[in-house]
From Swiss-Prot:
Signal peptide: none annotated. NCBIfam families: fen_arch. It comes from Methanosarcina acetivorans (strain ATCC 35395 / DSM 2834 / JCM 12185 / C2A). This is Flap endonuclease 1. The gene is fen. HAMAP family: Fen. Residues 116-257 are annotated as: I-domain. InterPro entries: 5-3_exonuclease_C_sf, Flap_endonuc, Flap_endonuc_arc, HhH2, PIN-like_dom_sf, XPG-I_dom, XPG/Rad2, XPG_CS. Belongs to the XPG/RAD2 endonuclease family. FEN1 subfamily. Keywords: DNA damage, DNA repair, DNA replication, Endonuclease, Exonuclease, Hydrolase, Magnesium, Metal-binding, Nuclease. It comes from the Archaea.
């Protein structure tokens, strides 16, 4: 997902407390995908209610968001709109991967291979419209704002940070920098120990921040050149050049100046290059949004999560209390200004 330029970026470890009282524009689809991939049972089966409806995303949204606001963080979730036409090939490939993974998951379960089953189950995750609508509803009754982007959610989130309506973008993908995001937080949705896919190895997943200007200075390039590097490697809108990884792409762009010169040197072309560039430099965004946190509605949370989706009443009530306490602390901070 996104572009593979992570090895070039300057990453810095931070704590949740470092984001206290900061507005974080969260890439909603990216975050929901993480919840759907990770919150699963041993055989890879997602959490479901008594009717068989998937609820892993609701669990992740409720409990992780409660932890974030409890830490003083002010999240606003940004949902993707209609994808650009140039993304259709990538979306088709992802669909094929999901369908293949789903078949392999069923086979692995039948064979009793739980490790393989879990791996393939993660790759079969899909954020559908019902999941999106349920997530928006849950955020609303939690008192957490969400915004519908006209196109790419990461582009909208980056725009909001550039406008100073938010302080950070939160996403696992690196596309945010191509859209101009000054600061991006990674691993905000899930931290702690994670098992590497296909390996009996666990790694610590820690919160980290990447700053665009710091990276550009270290690489001695500008943002347009970073976009060109990403296009060389491959983005959601193009496959990239054969056998060109991020480090090779960096050398090529620094040597030749831009991607047009690289393509001339290699006697190659990338179809729709200028359109691809424009999707990053002039993305479709909206100014029609409001960021407002409100008190959670405990009654609606109980009805939606416990009565309709079989969540533990005790756990939901505790999460609601955490959200209420954070909302009260936020209001107290605001009152100090007036």
């Amino acid at each position: 997902m996104g572009t593979d330029i992570g090895d070039l970026l300057q990453k810095r470890k931070i704590e949740l407390s470092d984001l206290s009282n900061r507005v974080v524009a969260v890439d909603a689809f990216n975050t929901l995908h993480q919840f759907l991939s990770i919150i699963r049972q041993r055989d890879g089966s997602p959490l479901v209610n008594s009717r068989g409806k998937v609820t892993s995303h609701l669990s992740g949204l409720l409990y992780r968001t409660a932890s974030l606001v409890e830490a003083g963080i002010k999240p606003v979730f940004i949902f993707d709109g209609k994808p650009p036409d140039l993304k259709s090939e990538t979306l088709s490939r992802r669909k094929e991967v999901r369908e293949t993974s789903l078949e392999k998951w069923e086979n692995a379960k039948a064979e009793g291979d739980l490790e393989a089953a879990y791996k393939y189950a993660q790759a079969s995750s899909r954020v559908d419209q019902e999941i999106v609508e349920d997530s928006k509803y849950l955020l609303g009754i939690m008192g957490i704002p969400w915004i519908q982007a006209p196109c790419e959610g990461e582009a909208q989130a980056a725009h909001m940070v550039l406008k100073k309506d938010a302080d950070y973008v939160a996403s696992q993908d690196y596309d945010s920098f191509l859209f101009g995001a000054p600061k991006v937080v990674r691993n905000m949705a899930v931290t702690g120990k994670r098992k590497l896919p296909g390996k009996n190895v666990y790694v610590d997943v820690e919160l980290e921040v990447i700053e665009l200007e710091e990276t550009l200075r270290a690489l001695e390039i500008n943002r347009d050149q970073l976009i060109d590097i990403a296009i060389c490697v491959g983005t959601d809108y193009n496959k990239g050049l054969e056998k060109v990884g991020p480090k090779t792409a960096l050398k090529l762009i620094k040597k030749h100046g831009d991607i047009h010169a690289v393509l001339r040197e290699k006697d190659m072309e990338i179809e729709g290059l200028d359109r691809i560039r424009k999707l990053f430099t002039h993305p479709e965004v909206t100014e029609d949004y409001e960021i407002k946190w409100t008190k959670p509605d405990s009654e609606k949370l109980i009805k939606f999560l416990c009565e309709e989706n079989d969540f533990s009443t005790d756990r939901v009530e505790k999460a609601a209390e955490r959200l209420k306490a954070a909302s009260g602390a936020r209001q107290k901070t605001l009152d100090q200004w007036f």
